[in-house]
């Protein structure tokens, strides 16, 4: 049985009480949720359900919106790819934020342009991760100072993304060239070897990274067998000869 969507192991009791009561629709809880987002960024925890609840409050109370909190939620959601959390958060934002500035029929209102640009840049990162274009993800992340500003509040962002990339890779391969994996993880040298051995628990032999066998990367044929009882088969034959009423 899978983990419920609204489950978060590190969620504080007072946040859980709000989410399971009518107060989740109370604008006065906005500050509490915003502080919780900050806590997630600092302590490397994550609570998608609470973050979406805050974005929903922003929908109903636009005057309470805090741009920095929105971008922090989006950045945190990148650390749990390939889950759909980024897209879920994106669809709770105002449409004008999602429209490219160059394609807008009119100039954005004061304060909208910076958030719109930030959201669209983060959407580019999400697309690269979702399409497994990991090398391009790291080069894009290093290409603009705005990216550095956006991820600054999220503690351990790069490490968390690398762990997710490694997890995804482990589901599809048994061996991969070290040089290729260095590009995918955006690191090299001693830092790369330390990450591979200590964090991933993999080994390196003659320039090749060996990924341990698991149920996802095991090349194993699947045989599907269905048992049909004779009485079931006879009913099918009988119906074929029955005259329509």
Swiss-Prot record:
The keyword Cytoplasm applies. It is found in: Cytoplasm. One of its GO terms (molecular function) is translation initiation factor activity. Residues 46-227 form the PCI domain. Disulfide bonds: none annotated. InterPro entries: ARM-type_fold, CSN8_PSD8_EIF3K, eIF3k, PCI_dom, Transl_init_fac_sub12_N_euk, WH-like_DNA-bd_sf, WH_DNA-bd_sf. One of its GO terms (cellular component) is eukaryotic 43S preinitiation complex. One of its GO terms (biological process) is formation of cytoplasmic translation initiation complex. Its main location: cytoplasm. Keywords: Cytoplasm, Initiation factor, Protein biosynthesis. Belongs to the eIF-3 subunit K family. Component of the eukaryotic translation initiation factor 3 (eIF-3) complex. Component of the eukaryotic translation initiation factor 3 (eIF-3) complex, which is involved in protein synthesis of a specialized repertoire of mRNAs and, together with other initiation factors, stimulates binding of mRNA and methionyl-tRNAi to the 40S ribosome. The eIF-3 complex specifically targets and initiates translation of a subset of mRNAs involved in cell proliferation. PANTHER family: EUKARYOTIC TRANSLATION INITIATION FACTOR 3 SUBUNIT 11, EUKARYOTIC TRANSLATION INITIATION FACTOR 3 SUBUNIT K. HAMAP family: eIF3k. This is Eukaryotic translation initiation factor 3 subunit K. The lineage of its organism: Eukaryota, Fungi, Dikarya, Ascomycota, Pezizomycotina.
């Amino acid at each position: 049985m899978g983990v419920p969507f609204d489950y978060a192991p590190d969620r504080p009791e007072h946040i859980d009480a709000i989410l399971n009561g009518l107060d989740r629709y109370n604008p006065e809880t906005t500050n509490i949720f915003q502080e919780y987002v900050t806590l997630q960024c600092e302590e490397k925890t994550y609570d998608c359900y609470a973050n979406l609840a805050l974005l929903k409050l922003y929908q109903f109370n636009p005057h309470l919106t805090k741009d920095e909190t929105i971008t922090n939620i989006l950045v945190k959601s990148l650390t749990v790819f390939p889950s759909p959390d980024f897209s879920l958060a994106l669809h709770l934002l105002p449409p004008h934020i999602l429209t490219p500035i160059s394609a807008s029929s009119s100039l954005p209102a004061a304060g909208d342009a910076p958030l719109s640009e930030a959201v669209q840049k983060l959407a580019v990162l999400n697309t690269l991760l979702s399409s497994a274009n990991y090398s391009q993800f790291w080069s894009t992340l290093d290409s603009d100072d705005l990216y550095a500003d956006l991820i600054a509040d999220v503690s351990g962002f790069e490490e968390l993304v690398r762990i997710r990339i490694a997890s995804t890779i482990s589901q599809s391969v048994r061996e991969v060239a070290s040089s290729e994996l260095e590009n995918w993880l955006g690191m090299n040298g001693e830092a790369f070897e330390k990450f591979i051995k200590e964090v991933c628990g993999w080994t390196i032999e003659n320039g090749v990274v060996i990924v341990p066998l698991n149920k996802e990367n095991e090349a194993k044929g699947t045989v599907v067998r269905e048992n049909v009882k004779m009485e079931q088969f006879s009913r099918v034959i009988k119906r074929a000869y029955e005259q329509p009423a």
